[in-house]
Amino acid sequence: MSDIENPAGDTRPIGVFDSGLGGLTVARAIATALPHESVYYFGDTKRCPYGTRTEDEVRSFALQAGRWLSKHDVKIMVIACNTATAAALRLAQQVLDVPVIGVIAPGARAAINSTRTRRVGVLATNLTIRSGAYTRAIQDLDAGVDVYGCPASSFVEVVEHELASGAHLQEQWLENEDIFDTPAVRALVGATVEPLRDHGIVALHRQLDAHYAA
């Protein structure tokens, strides 16, 4: 959570916004890294998933969430939704009266740090892929990394909302494995990452690494 500044003496809460419940993993990470902070969470479960929404709709939803969090006097807003980060981060930073950060930049840094072949595959919602947000974020940090985007809204929806068993999630993953026809060893899933650990995707990552390293 190095992207969150913590001014001394500012006891206001940190606001976290997501399209559903997946962002609770981000809230937990903040609580672990900054145990003395309070966190307010806004999960838009009524209108999720965002991956099938238009960009204008997602922007509107993000601003509504931001204004709600502002009314609760948060000192910073974390957009814990990749789709909302891609569609609305810049607008929210311009319009809202609190600092706003998203999750794409940290995800891009993690992808660069973990790839051994300088090739990254991105599985994300159609809107996130169309925005080019991950490609820009990764190549702004390292222009030598090749980025392969794969729209996979159904897979991301399963991941973010933990709607399936491990077997179902692996099936969804394999349905989208065409992206690995290119040697994109490290897959960056445009969704909250922690739930993946419970569904065997980490093991799939290791298999991919071993395959392309061979």
Please describe what each predicted stretch is.
Residues 1-214:
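Non-catalytic structural scaffold of enzyme domains
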